UniProtKB/Swiss-Prot annotation:
GO terms for molecular function: ATP binding; ATP hydrolysis activity. SUPFAM superfamilies: P-loop containing nucleoside triphosphate hydrolases (SSF52540), TPR-like (SSF48452). Part of the ESX-5 specialized secretion system, which is responsible for the secretion of EsxN and a number of PE_PGRS and PPE proteins. EccA5 exhibits ATPase activity and may provide energy for the export of ESX-5 substrates. InterPro entries: AAA+_ATPase, ATPase_AAA_core, CbxX/CfxQ, CbxX/CfxQ_RuBisCO_ESX, P-loop_NTPase, T7SS_EccA, T7SS_EccA1-like_N, TPR-like_helical_dom_sf. Belongs to the CbxX/CfxQ family. This is ESX-5 secretion system protein EccA5. ATP binds at G357, P358, P359, G360, T361, G362, K363, T364. It is found in: Cytoplasm. One of its GO terms (cellular component) is cytoplasm. NCBIfam families: T7SS_EccA. Keywords: ATP-binding, Cytoplasm, Nucleotide-binding.
Amino acid sequence: MTRAQSAADDARNAMVAGLLASGISVNGLQPSHNPQVAAKMFTTATKLDPAMCDAWLARLLAGDQTMDVLAGAWAAVRTFGWETRRLGVTDLQFRPEVSDGLFLRLAVTSVDSLACAYAAVLAENKRYQEASDLLDTTDPKHPFDAELVSYVRGVLYFRTKRWPDVLAQFPEATPWRHPELKAAGAAMATTALASLGVFEEAFRRAQEAIEGDRVPGAANIALYTQGMCLRHVGREEEAVELLRRVYSRDAKFSPAREALDNPNYRLVLTDPETIEARKDPWDPDSAPTRAQTEAARHAEMAAKYLAEGDAELNAMLGMEQAKKEIKLIKSTTKVNLARAKMGLPVPVTSRHTLLLGPPGTGKTSVARAFTKQLCGLTVLRKPLVVETSRTKLLGRYMADAEKNTEEMLEGSLGGAVFFDEMHTLHEKGYSQGDPYGNAIINTLLLYMENHRDELVVFGAGYAKAMEKMLEVNQGLRRRFSTVIEFFSYTPEELIALTKLMGQENEDVITEEEAQVLLPSYTRFYNDQNYSEDGDLIRGIDMLGNAGFVRNVVEKARDHRSFRLDDEDLDAVLNSDLTEFSELQMRRFRELTKEDLAEGLSAAVAEKKTN
């Protein structure tokens, strides 16, 4: 007999002695109950024959659930069950269990369940990647083992706070053969939902873990999470009641005690994006903070807004003075940001801007593009431009005007406000002044001054009318640091604008065809009147400048549609063709002189009717 054979026989004898000392009958021999002897014999067996997997499992049965024992069992997994089958020991007699460190004891009855038990202990010892790799090697054929693999993978994700992955392991609609696994999984899913801020769903899901109290530890976590969800939604009295219930069930459950002692104690909330941004997928502390994530997201959006604002401004026809002023403000803002970064003093300046000129000349478009630029430069938080006017802010009583203005401005913080026809804020005809206008202006002044670092106000209207309104309140005039003038579109610019608007939908308006509009555009431009305040108002201003041109083009398209409604159109619609030549499409893209002339006539008639 070789030394190896002798060691193997001695290991088998030690295994038998250990089983007998564990109360398990072998070969008809009477067992005893001596745990110390059993543990010693099983340890001897693994020393004599490390390849005997069942000897390692027997050490688990004897209570030796160290990492080394599980590692030894897994290293010898090729011989799983050999010795117990040789000795005629059944699974009911020989059933080692391993704690998952959280809720349950996992029975080791197969190779896959051994992998799960080992992975659970690896995860408990923060060897997360090894645990994940081990679970990846499993290919369970038995449905109970498949459930166990899912459960332990969920435990791994729960320990590492990978909440979306926890929810993926424990979908609500999935039936579980092991009710204990279902209850523990529900507790983990409850925590995941609450940590993602889905409080109502978390509160409801918790009932799966609480009902029946199958797994007390899981029920405690579910009750605790319910209490914290109630706290997050402002139902403090109910929250405290649940937290006390948890503490009465388990005084060692420290989160409940801490939450009771500190009313400001809250769950740590996160989101899937932050979890995915971790440098180490298993380490929650390697993720950027919510503030850092928000800053990165804001930086990404800022670049987008800056590019959009620049593109929109550059695409506008004419308005060279306006573009120059906006670029100057943008440059000043960038320099001030650089000075602040260098620790140099930066003057506190407002960016409130007066946009003076007739309607339809691009004031609103410039305000939107400028707001995007400021958002892109991180001066503003959002590219929101709230459009308002005196009419929108007035109420039945003077207090209504003040309240409406305050609510509008409060909702605009971080963005911009565009006051259309701002010169109408203060109206004439009141013997003691305009109380409604004063209420709006006084509220506006407070926000323009106190929130000038997070709010931009644009005031739009005619120049002389605006000047007279500002004379009523010099404080308001001083708040506007920039004045940009806009002018009526010239006949040539109106022609260029017509062609540009046609291109937006891939329509074709040639220079020759557009010239049919020039006499009318010239007449509208040269038609001059003066307002009561002394502002020059041209005929094209009354029509709406760019807005009028857009209406001309739209009406021209309507006429083209009517013109094209013939047999050829029906033939196109009824054919099976999916590709068309440039010549065929040109008929549907071209706006003719007739279309434009009819569009002009219809647009003028509509304006007169309105």
